[in-house]
């Protein structure tokens, strides 16, 4: 099935990635028309009060801001000031139809996906002037929001003191100043200051993309390295003349040189690949698994009726490929864990890779792949895939 791409008709994915990605903003008029009418404000206010939701309630009164985080209750929404916003994270967990809209951004590998956040605000509501350490596509799903973009920021950017959220006093010269209507999408690069104010009751959906930090990778490297016995052997250090209490610079440089040599070794390539893959495939939020077991007969009947299997977009499924003896070997990672090749037949691994690449699998494809339905049941119960029934398929 051909997927809609969230880009202007005159800009290709290759052009966007070379000219706009992490460089400059882009307005995409009617970039996600499928989003219009998918949710109403009351849907989000109700969801924010669910005990399993990750939500924030931000309000402003006389330039003093307040923040309340989950759990939220109906009482929290009583006697609010005029300007307030409620935000709910991880929306793909709650709506597979919304999660499928990630495919509109398949020109960016899914290992960079963060989550879909929604913000509801009545007229005048906002979360203030700020910047984010990630790239985001701001999609208008309901009502209108006025967006302003300003200067690029960094770690030296100053925030207002005495506020519970990161707020900037000013954004410098504005480079964008427009109102987004339902279906419109605004791409905002990482570290670009932005300020969105509801023109009327509105819902804005944020499709965030994030890269790992060096600290996350170092932590993962240390964890992965503990499983390699070769790294438990002490280093051999050339011993220069030194007084009893001194750790000499020469010894430090010797250890450093050996560590650099290790980082450039084939063993390190394996460790680093696994550490990076596990880090970027981890979910930020706890996965909500299905309440009921998947039924083989029901799945087979659904597929026969025209249903398809798709990746559950609240899970992260990625794969790496390496060349070994002139053969390409794939390694699959799901939600931060490497999948042992012995646990899944080769044909099922190939099917899982196709699902990770955004394909929908129907009955004919499943039969041709010769993958048993009980394997699909396991994937459903683990939250890896979902069944899209005919009436729920998004065109």
Regions found by a protein language model. Give the residues of each.
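Fe(II)/2-oxoglutarate
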Residues: 1-5, 167-179, 195-395
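Active-site region of the double-stranded beta-helix
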Residues: 1-20, 32-184, 192, 197-241, ...
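Short, surface-exposed loop and linker segments with low hydrophobicity and enrichment for Pro/Ser/Thr
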Residues: 18-22, 75-83, 318-329, 377
């Amino acid at each position: 099935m051909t997927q809609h791409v969230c880009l202007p008709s005159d800009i290709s994915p290759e052009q966007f990635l070379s000219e706009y990605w992490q460089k400059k903003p882009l307005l995409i008029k009617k970039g996600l028309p499928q989003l219009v009418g998918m949710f109403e404000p009351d849907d989000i206010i109700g969801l924010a009060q669910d005990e399993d939701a990750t939500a924030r309630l931000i309000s402003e009164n006389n330039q003093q801001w307040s923040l309340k985080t989950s759990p939220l209750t109906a009482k929290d929404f009583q006697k609010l000031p005029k300007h307030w916003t409620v935000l709910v994270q991880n929306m793909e967990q709650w709506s597979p139809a919304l999660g499928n809209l990630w495919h509109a951004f398949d020109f960016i590998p899914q290992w960079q996906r963060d989550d879909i956040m929604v913000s509801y605000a009545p007229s005048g509501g906002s979360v203030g002037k700020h910047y984010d350490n990630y790239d985001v596509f701001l999609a208008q799903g309901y009502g209108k929001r006025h967006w302003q973009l300003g200067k690029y920021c960094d770690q030296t950017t100053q925030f207002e003191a005495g506020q519970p959220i990161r707020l900037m006093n000013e954004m410098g010269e504005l480079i964008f100043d427009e109102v987004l209507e339902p279906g419109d999408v605004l791409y905002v690069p990482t570290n670009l200051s932005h300020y969105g104010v509801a023109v009327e009751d509105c819902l804005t959906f944020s499709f965030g993309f994030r890269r790992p930090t060096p600290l996350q990778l170092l932590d993962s490297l240390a964890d992965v390295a503990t499983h390699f016995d070769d790294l438990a052997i002490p280093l051999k250090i050339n011993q220069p003349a030194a007084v009893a209490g001194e750790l000499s610079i020469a010894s430090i440089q010797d250890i450093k040189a050996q560590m650099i040599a290790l980082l450039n070794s084939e063993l390190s390539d394996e460790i680093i690949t696994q550490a990076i893959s596990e880090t970027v495939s981890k979910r930020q939020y706890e996965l909500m698994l299905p309440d009921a077991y998947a039924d083989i007969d029901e799945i087979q009947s659904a597929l026969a009726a025209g249903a398809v299997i798709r990746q559950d977009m609240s899970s992260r499924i990625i794969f790496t490929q390496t060349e070994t003896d002139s053969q390409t070997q794939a390694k699959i990672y799901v939600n931060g864990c490497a999948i042992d090749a012995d646990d899944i037949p080769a044909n099922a691994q190939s099917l899982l890779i196709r699902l990770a690449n955004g394909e929908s699998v129907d009955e004919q494809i499943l039969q041709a792949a010769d993958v048993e339905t009980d394997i699909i049941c396991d994937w459903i119960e683990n939250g890896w895939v979902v069944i899209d029934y005919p009436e729920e398929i998004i065109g």
